[in-house]
Amino acid sequence: PHHTTSAVALVGGGSIPRPGEISLAHHGVLFLDELPEFPRKVLEVLREPLESREIMISRVNAQSRFPANFQLIAAMNPCPCGFLGSSRCRCTPDQVRRYKDKISGPLLDRIDLQVEVPHLPSEKLIQTKTEGKGIDCESSAEVYQRVKTARQHQLNRAGKLNALMSNQEVMEHCTLDNETKDLLNRAIQKLGLTARGF
């Protein structure tokens, strides 16, 4: 959906409730490009379905429940102009902070994996691995095999994917040794993780 999409179009609604984009993406991917450009009110309606994997739409006469088990993938620039860290960037630190603050902490807590993609010079992008200087990339087939193996490991261990495990099941199937607990504790401190984010 485009960043001008309304909350009703995104999660569903109307006088006769109809499913929105999140239900249409059930068991699939919902991609939101230019995330901070969406109105904050629209983004905040994602919090409930990201947690419960469904959306409840209440009207005077009835409530409608729609499935919403989707994988959210969102993209954003590092600053309003998109050139943070480059001589082309003219954004002030305050503009960068306001831009990033358009996405609330509670919504960010529900996004499990956040990756910053650094700017790469064009010569790096066009170099090939065979030239000895290019970016070392896995083929799609290699990535597919790693993902397939990881999913099978999860299914063998708990009978379901990690994302579908309850807190109790995580405690039962994902026991940690002391070294791992120490690493996680340091990560919580360093990254400022909340209980939900952890």
Outline where the language-model segments fall:
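Conserved alpha-helical scaffold flanking the Walker A/P-loop in AAA+ ATPase domains
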Residues: 5-30, 63
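Basic, amphipathic alpha-helical bundle interface domains used for macromolecular binding and assembly
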Residues: 16-17, 40-198
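P-loop NTPase switch/communication element
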Residues: 1-12, 70-71, 79
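Residues immediately C-terminal
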Residues: 30-31, 37-38, 122
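Walker B catalytic acidic pair
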Residues: 27, 33-35, 45
